[in-house]
Amino acid sequence: MRYLSGGLTALALAHPLTAQLPPLDSLQRASVVAGYHAAFLCSAVFVAGRDPASVAREELSPELLDSPGDTGRLVRPLRTGIDREARRTFAVPRYPDDPFFRGEPRLAVFREGRGCTLLPPGTSAAAAAAKLPPVPRWSAPDGSNRPWPDGDRLPSTPLPPEVDSQRLAAVVASAFAGPAASHHTLGVVVLYRGRLVAERYAKGWGVYTQYRTWSTAKSIANALIGVLVGRGMLDVHVPAPIPEWRNPLDPRGAITLDHLLRMSSGLQSSGSQTPLGYWGGIDIAADAASAPLERAPGTRWKYSNYDTILLLRAARVVLGDEAYAAFPREALLDRIGMYHTFPETDPFGNYILSSQVYSTPRDLARFGLLFLNDGVWNGERILPEGWVAYSTRQAPTQDPRSRSDGWGYGAQWWLLGTDSYTSAGRRGQFTTVVPSRGVVVVRTGLDPEPSRWDQSGFVARVLETIRR
């Protein structure tokens, strides 16, 4: 590692590309991969406070990276850097067929309370400062002396007698053992009846170290829509308020929020692969809204990042830009003590709640606890009555028998049988709720793809340590 003028840290990173994605031309692929690097480096350094070398090793290394692009096409190093004073990162794409070509640099900028935003290709930091939507003023309250779950001060009293603490500690420790080729656990938190009864972190990670939630963010999107339903601003069973679909002749106008929540919009999509949306610096909501209809709404289940993006598009329409910018914190995060959770946006101010949220295991445990308590927090109803039951009801267009793990799907939550449900994100991110046992189990990871972590089995072993 060497230091350049202006406080920039330069890293040379090379990687194989393994994802099978929609076709992009060579310039787009180069730009998307550069955007991936700039965005990850920005969030890891300025949101999570991690060391750049560990980011390169643990997230952008050849063994762990599943980056956007065609297999084997973009193997040349990218030049990346960090400007700590300006709190931004950059990555310079290199065209694979011409070693002398340099693409337009990709910049990601950090803003307090909002995390990092990846800019469109070629956008300068000065231009971004003038064009990026404003961020509401916010600073994280100090929760260190506030009692759990609103804060982080844990009780000193003994654990409930039904918890076998030694056996539970051994089960949690087992999550951090085993071959690295199989899994790489970052953190585990276990709640029982609201109390934090077990917690452990990998070396170099701690209570306040954030990591990307990946698709666990979709369950957070569910909660935000629930808040708006409770306020009477949205109805899941009427056509979604997407401006691009308002033409009476547009068949997409029949798509409801229920269809979007249950991944049954019928829209054309590349499923969980959205390279341009995530790393291209485009208006992700407009891109999602432009998708044509493939099947009649409500007749097909297809997991799609863009169905979730469109939920937030609807939220922005009914709230307006200013209220939308403050909405995740005002409506949910700050109300339940999730002060170390940062939902990020595209450069047009759209929350990317299909994936792009940075959080901690404790904050995710708080989120699971909200659902365990039927949407009530400290006696205050945050989610409307019946919302949790609605969210955990099987989607009619998805058959659990079609999956090897037997998981069903509700409304932005996966269903594990009749009495538990979970959020699930790539590389092993899980927030699992078991209502009949009063248990929440959070596991975060940096697993190689495809992850071989068995969350169902892990939760079962945790439950064995807590007597009924």
Labelled PLM ranges:
Residues 340-345, 388-440:
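Active-site Gly/Thr loop motif
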Residues 152-193:
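Beta-lactamase-like hydrolase cores
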Residues 219-223, 307-315, 355-376, 429-445:
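Active-site-proximal alpha-helical segments within enzyme catalytic domains
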Residues 123-125, 129, 420-468:
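Structured C-terminal helix/loop/strand segments within mature extracytoplasmic catalytic/sensor domains
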Residues 194, 211-237, 260, 311-315, ...:
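Active-site SXXK
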Residues 52, 232-236, 316-329, 375-384, ...:
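Structural helix-adjacent loops and short alpha-helical linkers that scaffold large soluble proteins
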Residues 230-266, 290-293, 319-355, 359:
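Active-site helix/loop module of the DD-peptidase/beta-lactamase fold
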